[in-house]
Amino acid sequence: QRDDAKFLASIPCSACFNEQRTGKTPTALEVIKLRRLQEERILIITTASSIYQWKEEYETWLGKPCEVCAGTPTNKMKAIGSWTHGLVVSLDSFKETESRSGLVQPILAREPKMVILDEAHKIKNPKSANAKAAFKTKNIPFRLALTGTPAQGKPYDVFSILKFLFPSDFGSYWRFIDEYFEIQDNVVWQGGRPRHFKTYDNFRPDKAAQLQEILNQFSTQRKRKDVMPWLPDKFYQKVKLNPSRDQKKYLRELEETYRTEDIITTGTLDRLVRYRQICLDPTLIGLDGKSPKTEWILQYLKDYPDEQIIIFSKFTSYLIKLSEQLETSWALLVGSTPTKQRGQFIKDFQAGKFKVFLINIDAGKEALTLDAAETTIFTDKFPPIGSIEQAEDRFIASTEEKAHKAHKIIELMIADTFDEQIYKLLEKRKSETDIINNYNQYIKERRKSNGHKSTVPVSGSYQRAV
């Protein structure tokens, strides 16, 4: 990573094409340090589902504030106005379309010194709004593109990244195609009429090597299995989401008493269950309000439409509610799923017949091989830890080829709540009893910090009946 950062920082415009899980984010942030731009405005353009992750990494690695351009139009403009160091914006918010102006102009007006384009393959179509927005950053002095797949489909898909980095050298798409690829004229007959079109799937003689040599001059292209063979089969990404206004209200009321709105809890365990449900989706228990976790999942599915994904939850009711909002193919596996149907779901998922597999943690802890998935999302976790570990192991590779796939486990949590604390306790392999006792202590400390005197029992050990 240090060697890559030094190389990438040595030229004004560069690209990190290293495979997933080789540390492109810290490498990019190290480039900022090496260029001595820590005190300058840095623009980071990424997918909407990654903006908070970038903020956390930026502030951790550089020790400087990083604004997030998200939420309402007012909040986005406020973030741009407060921008002093880092600013993270989604490509969807940044780009201009026929129906909205986007944030290109107000962001560029702040004159950032460097732009990092994450998931740069998303601009592969040079005529798309994504690409046109990226091209407008051409006057930013330092530009860095990040992607593990610079040419996802065809070799010429790399053109837009080249234009983003070197607009004066790669200004014309068709000049690029004519230079490097053999153009073939084709005709098909439709309704008795010919339709002519061109294809250019093959390189001209020696042009593949020439284009590769150009890429080598400004990019790193490392393979995970070559440079990091010690990596574990799976890696974790914690996504901390801000609670909605309604969630803050409900959680605060539960911390102060045993009720919120019309929900009355009857003890510590019941209160903790309701607390977890509110963090997941307030509507699960008949309360108003949005679910930041659901919104994040739906955005992630839009950002990565080609991924096969497993989504785990302890609450079947949430998985059912989530399924009603999915705009892609899915299947639901819970405790009541018949054995025969369960087997068919597994077979179909492995064959790529649907994209999202919704699974109750307790129902999916055994007898499942789902290595077609690259990503698993946990919307919530709760003991026993053994069930969670079994669920995480559903995509252990069944073939040598699949052993080299990146297996990512995303943990969704509501920031600065006990929902976040549960994940920390599970990392220490705490039991259900330990977590409930910690919840009692958490409530006690929260009430104390809020200046409330204790009027309800908030301490004491909980022992689960055996």
Indicate residue ranges for each PLM-predicted region:
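SF2 helicase motor core recognition
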Residues: 96-97, 153-155, 317-323, 342-343, ...
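A conserved SF2-helicase RecA2
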Residues: 383-389, 395-466
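Interdomain linker/hinge connecting the two RecA-like lobes of the SF2 helicase core
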Residues: 12-15, 126-127, 173-177, 183-303, ...
